[in-house]
Amino acid sequence: MAAQGFLLIATFLLVLMVLARPLGSGLARLINDIPLPGTAGVERILFRLPGVSDHEMNWKQYLCAILGLNMLGLAVLFFMLLGQHYLPLNPQQLPGLSWDLALNTAVSFVTNTNWQSYSGETTLSYFSQMAGLTVQNFLSAASGIAVIFALIRAFTRQSMSTLGNAWVDLLRITLWVLVPVALLIALFFIQQGALQNFQPYQAVNTVEGAQQLLPMGPVASQEAIKMLGTNGGGFFNANSSHPFENPTALTNFVQMLAIFLIPTALCFAFGEVTGDRRQGRMLLWAMSVIFVICVGVVMWAEVQGNPHLLALGADSSINMEGKESRFGVLVSSLFAVVTTAASCGAVIAMHDSFTALGGMVPMWLMQIGEVVFGGVGSGLYGMMLFVLLAVFIAGLMIGRTPEYLGKKIDVREMKLTALAILVTPTLVLMGAALAMMTDAGRSAMLNPGPHGFSEVLYAVSSAANNNGSAFAGLSANSPFWNCLLAFCMFVGRFGVIIPVMAIAGSLVSKKSQPASSGTLPTHGPLFVGLLIGTVLLVGALTFIPALALGPVAEYLS
């Protein structure tokens, strides 16, 4: 079993790096504001039609463009969900959503979280799935990538005030990266057996003679961007464990690759744009070390089995509860770590049925800010916050003004870095405390004791860090939970983007200092260790008391 797990992890990472390297070169061209071959004429036409200016923006203008697009998308999606019964492509005549569920869902998809307090096949029409959710899957992913584009430019430009043009970046990211790759993935999914139609639900007779209603819909097109954009919201309630979304072992492997593809490519692009590819490799090494350790822990915990079931005489020594038999425990463990290391949240197994330690690792990966590969754009700019913090700590230890890539890190940058890092832990801890203090929060818990608290902690951690996966034993479709999680998702997304853009605006105006004998090397194994230590100390220690009350207490009981 250990050899199989090692081979699975090694194969996954090897294929991932091979695919991400050329994509990283393409992203580097876009960051350097170099149009891809044959696209310049199309871009000019698309900008001329609505009269959008392609002049460079300062950080405030860039931020306002990103926020404006997302707020408009939030309003449109909210009203679309409220009135979906008036809109076309609704063969099942599904009614509009309640205001609190519509708000939660709109915020969820605009913030790239894709938390779902509903069952897709019984709640949303085809129009809502396509024109509402799928569109936001593209736009939220493009928004995250655009923010990291601006931050990378801040390190490579000197004595400037501009970071690029948000509309140009959003257009190029969507048209030349997300749409083509998602189209290829969608066609592959269709070839493998995923659904893509507009038919009404089909009544069929089962082998037992009973009648069953099979949901239909344009699944493959949404499934592709759901994974590529690290969105994670399933067309069906069972998400990627549903055979209509994820029909074969091959589609499952491609889904995992799609989740990590752009975050990995952005690391390669970062090294290429900064002129030192070792910087990108340093980030990948730090992420990969944490990732491999986490996968190993989850695999070990799930192979050991559930002690409570073993005590009752379970006929298997491994924990197969809540897992698809066609995928097995090792693949389910790898997928769980992939989807929570990134801000994806898609699942092929029920995380609520994992062992105490097996479920704690995905929760912890979210709580550290999803900086281990992370979401498209958000993972890298989240890790860059820890890089700046690690550089600052190292500067204090050696008595030098901290600097990174030649840019001095001053008080303003460190205040903004601390603010950005503290946003999500504050939301998680205060949100969990509020839920446990109120009857409305506690009434949603379907399990008592430490596991019930783990369900609450996981939900708030998932929302605040824009993941979207859940311990499904929490009945979250209530006004209290819909509003609480919507607030956590909104602030967790934009409460980090705003200080990140402010940091970019500060760094881009500085001159780049040449490296000297006293400059801290930020590309070697020493800095990789320092960065991992910073993530563990700052990102993880915050949650030790909460984890002790939940999964740790469950493990020891």
UniProtKB/Swiss-Prot annotation:
Q: What is this protein called?
A: Potassium-transporting ATPase potassium-binding subunit
Q: Where in the cell is it found?
A: Cell inner membrane
Q: Which family does it belong to?
A: Belongs to the KdpA family.
| Annotated HAMAP family | KdpA (MF_00275)
| Top-level division of the source organism's lineage | Bacteria
- Relate the protein's function as given in its record: Part of the high-affinity ATP-driven potassium transport (or Kdp) system, which catalyzes the hydrolysis of ATP coupled with the electrogenic transport of potassium into the cytoplasm. This subunit binds the periplasmic potassium ions and delivers the ions to the membrane domain of KdpB through an intramembrane tunnel.
Instruction: Name the principal localization, coarsely classed.
Output: membrane
| Alphabetical UniProt keywords | Cell inner membrane, Cell membrane, Ion transport, Membrane, Potassium, Potassium transport, Transmembrane, Transmembrane helix, Transport
Assembly, in brief, is: The system is composed of three essential subunits: KdpA, KdpB and KdpC.
